[in-house]
Amino acid sequence: MSRVCELTGAKANNGMAVSHSHIRTKKLQQVNLQKRRLWWEEGKKWVNIKISTKALKSIQKVGLDKFAKSNGVDLQKF
């Protein structure tokens, strides 16, 4: 199972962990993914989808259908 948001395509970011003595080591910052069952009003069905919490906030603001269309995602495949 890949750690990629199915709506936005957000994935892990490579960063550095910096200690108090300024020793830098590589660190992977993962996306906060959640499995959600969302109601798709236009399709009149439930959609099981793995999305980031940032995408979930956007869906609550503008709606699932509008957000999916703006990101070029077809909800029929879910």
UniProtKB/Swiss-Prot annotation:
Pfam families: Ribosomal_L28
Keywords: Ribonucleoprotein, Ribosomal protein
Gene name of this polypeptide: rpmB
Protein name: Large ribosomal subunit protein bL28
HAMAP family registered for this protein in UniProt: Ribosomal_bL28
SUPFAM superfamilies listed in its UniProt record: L28p-like
PANTHER family assigned: 39S RIBOSOMAL PROTEIN L28, MITOCHONDRIAL, LARGE RIBOSOMAL SUBUNIT PROTEIN BL28M
GO molecular function, one term: structural constituent of ribosome
GO cellular component labels: ribonucleoprotein complex; ribosome
GO aspect biological process, one term: translation
Protein family: Belongs to the bacterial ribosomal protein bL28 family.
